[in-house]
Regions:
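Fe(II)/2-oxoglutarate oxygenase catalytic core
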Residues: 1-154, 158-209
Length: 209
């Protein structure tokens, strides 16, 4: 399912912070099955697995992403022992115009993994995540990542790991997985995302009505 050799061969970039980007990390032959089993998400925002139907090829993908082979490669790349840290993940199916504002991930996160699962060619100007040199402007960036099918972005979470993207409104499928400092963080974040997801569903029902 994953091209582990390509990941091993991908160099870690160290400016403006530690990160790596790899296109086609998910092998193209899995596109149809994973796309078919991608959970149904009607609104924008991050949804924890407890609020979604995780099944089939998508479930297999998540099990591999949280598996020992991927963890070992990322541990070596970032010179970390990730075996002692728990993971958590959320799924996004849509992007709202206000999403993508410049930010760093929280201090409770050690490494962030973003795996994009959109069509092979992203034709939009918005929604392309930028690795930023500073928090001052989206135009001050080191690299722009197209959220094409199977594109992987992994970065070390620091006080300077600024990122964001231009506004986009529409379908934008991405999985975010994090290694975090403790199980308490997992419980807190999953609970927070769960409450947020329920509120989004209620809001969506009222809007459709």
């Amino acid at each position: 399912m994953f091209d582990y050799q390509a990941l091993k061969d991908t160099a870690l970039k160290t400016a403006p912070y530690d990160y790596l980007v790899l296109e086609k990390f998910v092998e193209p032959s899995f596109f149809e099955n994973v796309a078919s089993d991608f959970p149904e998400i009607s609104g924008a925002g991050s949804f924890p697995p407890s609020q979604l139907k995780i099944q089939g090829a998508f479930k297999q993908l998540m099990e591999a992403l949280d598996g020992p082979t991927f963890r070992e490669i990322i541990s070596e790349k970032f010179n970390l022992n990730l075996d002692k840290y728990p993971t958590m993940y959320t799924v996004r199916g849509r992007c709202a115009p206000h999403n993508g504002q410049i930010h760093c991930d929280s201090a409770s996160k050690i490494v962030t993994v973003l795996l994009y699962l959109n069509d092979a060619a992203w034709g939009e100007d918005g929604g392309r995540l930028r690795v930023l040199n500073s928090p001052d402007s989206l135009e001050d960036y080191a690299e722009e990542i197209n959220p094409n099918w199977g594109t992987l972005l992994v970065f070390r979470c620091t006080k300077d790991s600024w990122h964001g993207h231009k506004s986009f409104d529409g379908v934008r499928r991405v999985v975010q997985m994090n290694w975090v400092i403790s199980d308490d963080v997992v419980k807190k974040e999953q609970r927070r995302h769960g409450i947020s997801a329920k509120l989004k569903k209620i809001t969506s029902i009222f809007k459709s009505g």
